UniProtKB/Swiss-Prot annotation:
Key words, A-Z: ATP-binding, Lyase, NAD, NADP, Nucleotide-binding
Name of the molecule in the record: ADP-dependent (S)-NAD(P)H-hydrate dehydratase
Gene behind the chain: nnrD
Xref: InterPro entries: CARKD, Ribokinase-like
Cofactor names: Mg(2+)
Chemical reaction(s) catalysed: (6S)-NADHX + ADP = AMP + phosphate + NADH + H(+); (6S)-NADPHX + ADP = AMP + phosphate + NADPH + H(+)
Complex and partners: Homotetramer.
EC number from the UniProt entry: 4.2.1.136
CDD domains, A to Z: YXKO-related
Superkingdom of origin: Bacteria
Broadest EC class assigned to this enzyme: lyase
PROSITE patterns: YJEF_C_3
Residues given in the record as AMP binding sites: K197, G198, A199, D200, S201, G226
Binding sites annotated in the UniProt record for (6S)-NADPHX: A44, H160, D227
Length: 289
């Protein structure tokens, strides 16, 4: 019995799944909402937000801990920033009507960067998911084995091997030995697009489609790198890509940015904040449909 066909994510393959035309209006390129962060880790939301804008999204909203929201608004003038209730540890624990309205009005959202995975944050994640009518990218603190996307509206889940192991209740070594199998199984179980990130990143769709991007550079294994990937995917989704296409473009562009930085700065040591500025030039050089 043969396994599923594995397709390779390349620039040529993406030609068959082109991005929507850039257009001249920010409304046409969509609105992205990033929900996450904490008083101790506010930067994750900013990394994802900048990546979404660099991918071409037209508008950006950030929802994070109220104590850091004013500073974030000053640091990122391109974004509308919402402050959320937090507990004594600075973790966001409560949504509100403004977040509900933002979630129901966005074209793509990222939930989870910089968030801890706790019972209290789980309630916030559930509330946000329940309000959403857009493509959702779930990362870090939003990942849960209980997730299951609505029929016809797959989530995009972006676990690394350790997070995938936690979702599966297995050890990390098992995931690293068979990442494609885990991606396929959980894509079907969660009715979602699942990216198991690594040097070779596997992307599986709920219909059994399986893709691999090979040759990621070691320097991408750095703090905040996954936040930029999640933001890129949301940016492409906001522009009009379906969940799988947005994931494939995100993985390829993220890896290409890493290769450029490795060549210019060094194999390791470049920073996650340096990834988003690479993106517009990469998009201009990639083949168009």
């Amino acid at each position: 019995m043969t396994g599923p066909r594995v397709r390779t994510v390349t620039a040529a393959a993406l030609r068959a799944q082109p991005l929507p035309a850039p257009g001249g209006d920010k409304e046409q390129r969509g609105r992205v909402l990033i929900v996450g962060g904490s008083a101790r880790v506010p930067g994750a939301v900013m990394l994802a937000g900048e990546a979404a804008l660099r991918a071409g999204a037209g508008k950006l909203q950030l929802a994070t801990a109220a104590s850091v929201a004013p500073g974030m608004a000053l640091a990122m003038p391109e974004a509308l920033v919402l402050g959320l209730g937090e507990n004594g540890q600075g973790e966001i624990v409560r949504g509100h009507r403004a977040l509900d309205a933002a979630m129901s009005a966005c074209d793509a959202a990222v939930i989870g960067p910089g968030m801890a995975s706790t019972n209290t944050t789980a309630a916030l994640v559930k509330r946000a998911i329940d309000q959403a009518v857009c493509t959702l990218v779930l990362d870090a603190g939003a990942l849960s084995p209980r997730l299951r996307a609505p029929l016809g509206r797959p989530f995009v889940l972006t676990p690394h091997a350790g997070e995938m192991a936690a979702l599966a209740g297995d050890d990390k070594a098992a995931v690293e030995a068979a990442p494609a199998d885990y991606a396929l199984a959980f894509a079907k179980k969660m009715r979602s697009v699942v990216i198991v990130k690594g040097a070779d990143s596997f992307v599986a769709g709920p219909d059994g489609a399986l893709w691999v991007h090979r040759g990621g550079v070691p320097g991408l294994g750095t703090s905040g790198s996954g936040d930029t990937l999640a933001g890129l995917i949301a940016g492409f989704a906001a522009r009009g890509c379906d969940a799988l296409t947005a994931a494939l473009w995100g993985v390829f562009v993220h890896a290409t940015a890493g290769k450029q930085l490795a060549k210019r700065i060094g194999t390791v040591g470049f920073l996650a904040r340096e990834i988003p500025p690479e993106v517009p030039g990469i998009l201009d050089r990639l083949p168009r449909g």
